[in-house]
Amino acid sequence: MVKPTLVSNTIRAHRERAGLTQAELARTIGVTRQTLIAIEQQKYSPTLELAFQIARAFGVGLDDLFAYPTDPGGAA
């Protein structure tokens, strides 16, 4: 079983605001629709290169799309 990523994202919200379908955004960034779905559902973290491509597609920075918890493991 694939472990969900701790990285959250707002890709779906940005995509919907831009009026893009999953297929359109996937084509723009060069991935399959299934890959985009997995990223939007936080089941898969994109590579850094792909993350930049997604951010560029919306004209925003990485920190506008992705967030990582400040204490992901509950440090002792």
Q: What positions do the PLM features span?
A:
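Residue-level signal for the short linker/turn that defines the boundary of a DNA-recognition helix
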Residues: 9, 19-20, 46-49
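Short, charged recognition helix plus adjacent turn
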Residues: 1, 56, 66-76
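A short, Lys/Arg-rich alpha-helix, primarily the initiator
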Residues: 1-17
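Short alpha-helical DNA-recognition segment
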Residues: 20-38
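Key DNA-contact positions within bacterial/archaeal DNA-binding proteins
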Residues: 34, 44, 63
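DNA major-groove recognition helix of helix-turn-helix/homeodomain DNA-binding modules
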Residues: 49-64
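Alpha-helical residues within the helix-turn-helix
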Residues: 16, 27, 56
